[in-house]
């Protein structure tokens, strides 16, 4: 965990285990706030940045689970209009779950990629990577993963569902 050790020793076990889940949900909500009707564009920077830092270096299944929760925090309010249009919550819940699965894949992938030696600054440096700090390389790799997942979400399945791309915020 990333909290100071004296804080962890005083906090109950359930709080230590549930804090990352709450942070993932709140990061998703912060990202949602960048979209209309809230339109706080800068909250996307906070939400996505917290998501990236929260999952960095975690185990695969932890990253996957936190990605799923981040997706719930983002897509539950963002796709609420589908319940209004359908008159029942079934489509809203199904679409929220399906779209959140993409971010679960992103969370799992980022948890693996973020542990690469190149991104931790421990890899043997080539002529190209010598000039790129490990932190900047991490942001670049995360942006590539995020863009890839958004593109996949936009084209698959059945022509995709591009609603909720970060560029729309």
Question: Where do the model's predicted regions map?
Answer:
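Extreme N-terminal basic, low-complexity initiation segments
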Residues: 1-5
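Membrane-embedded alpha-helical bundles of multi-pass enzymes
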Residues: 6-169
């Amino acid at each position: 965990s990333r909290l100071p050790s004296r804080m962890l020793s005083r906090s109950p076990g359930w709080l230590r285990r549930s804090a990352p889940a709450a942070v993932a949900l709140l990061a998703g909500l912060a990202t949602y706030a960048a979209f209309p009707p809230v339109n706080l564009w800068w909250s996307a920077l906070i939400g996505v940045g917290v998501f990236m830092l929260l999952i960095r270096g975690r185990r695969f299944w932890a990253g996957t689970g936190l990605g799923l929760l981040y997706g719930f925090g983002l897509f539950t309010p963002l796709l609420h209009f589908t319940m209004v249009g359908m008159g029942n919550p079934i489509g809203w819940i199904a679409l929220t779950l399906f779209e959140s699965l993409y971010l679960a894949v992103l969370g799992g992938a980022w948890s693996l990629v973020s542990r690469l030696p190149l991104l931790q600054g421990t890899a043997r440096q080539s002529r190209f990577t010598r000039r790129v700090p490990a932190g900047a390389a991490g942001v670049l790799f995360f942006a590539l993963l995020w863009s890839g997942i958004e593109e996949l979400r936009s084209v698959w399945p059945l022509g995709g569902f591009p609603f909720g791309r970060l560029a729309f915020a």
